[in-house]
């Protein structure tokens, strides 16, 4: 079924006559030309799906929502960096993170009768992922570009590990709980580029570290180019805020 999450009534019609015990809601947008589209897709789409399942009295055992570590934004930015925890106050610094947070808040507002579990993966890599592929292309062309001079701690999770976490949540997740997902390691930007370099056979590489205003200029140009051409780009305002954030550590112990 190709569900239409933008139209609540049509969505209910599409779900009518079906019974689902388990739902994994991974549909969403990570890049949009217009800021409002993040909220139409990520927030409203989640709300429409949850409302439809409730209205149809779907006999759900688990509803797993794929959110993001980005809902927290730049918290715990003072060195030495410590792990972001579920007790921190979210301050998302991207439209994507804000839209995911609003979706989480809507699920929280429904109440205990809706058996939802929220997964918050950090940067996900794997087949068909584009942003990290661009980094690999840059290293392959012998350029390692980093922005900002202050230490940056970054974290990742492989897509297959996210899938495994989904199955664990479906089997054992506690309703109303939120879990961070990462591989448990912390990397510097240099560590990351070195990993890519080794995977590519150790090509020679020129390391360039630029001030953040250079990144601001690049992403500003990318944003305007996207608006003029109508083509979504990875070099946008959200990407600037993501790369400015220095601490991506997260507490995975509850998971």
What is each stretch, according to the model?
Residues 102, 129-134, 148-170, 176-177:
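Substrate-positioning beta->alpha
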Residues 91-119:
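Active-site Tyr-X1-5-Lys
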Residues 5-44, 48, 69-74:
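NAD(P)H-binding glycine-rich loop region in Rossmannoid oxidoreductase-like domains
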Residues 48-95:
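Conserved Rossmann-fold NAD(P)-dependent oxidoreductase catalytic core, especially the SDR/UDP-sugar
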Residues 169-235, 252:
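Mid/C-terminal beta-alpha module of Rossmann-like enzyme folds, strongest
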Residues 72, 117-134:
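Flexible, glycine-rich beta-alpha linker
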């Amino acid at each position: 079924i190709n569900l239409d999450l933008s139209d609540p009534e049509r969505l209910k019609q599409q779900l009518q006559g079906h019974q689902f015990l388990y739902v994994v809601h991974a549909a969403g947008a990570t890049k949009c030309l217009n800021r409002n589209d993040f909220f139409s897709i990520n927030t409203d789409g989640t709300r429409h799906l949850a409302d439809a399942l409730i209205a149809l009295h779907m006999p759900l055992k688990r509803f797993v929502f794929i959110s993001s570590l980005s809902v927290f934004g730049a918290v715990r930015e003072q060195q030495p960096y410590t792990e972001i925890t579920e007790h921190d106050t979210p301050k998302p610094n991207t439209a994507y993170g804000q839209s995911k947070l609003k979706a989480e808040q809507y699920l929280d507002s429904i109440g205990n009768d809706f058996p939802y579990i929220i997964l918050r993966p950090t940067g996900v890599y794997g087949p068909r992922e584009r942003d990290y592929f661009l980094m690999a292309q840059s290293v392959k062309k012998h350029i390692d570009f980093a922005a900002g001079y202050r230490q940056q701690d970054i974290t990742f999770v492989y897509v297959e590990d996210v899938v495994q976490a989904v199955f664990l949540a479906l089997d054992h997740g506690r309703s109303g709980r939120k879990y961070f997902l990462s591989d448990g390691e912390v990397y510097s930007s240099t560590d990351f580029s070195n990993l890519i370099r080794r995977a590519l056979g150790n090509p020679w590489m020129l390391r360039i570290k630029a001030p953040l205003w250079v990144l601001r200029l690049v992403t500003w140009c990318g944003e305007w180019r996207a608006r003029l051409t109508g083509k979504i780009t990875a070099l946008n305002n959200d990407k600037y805020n993501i790369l400015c954030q220095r601490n991506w550590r997260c507490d995975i112990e509850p998971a």
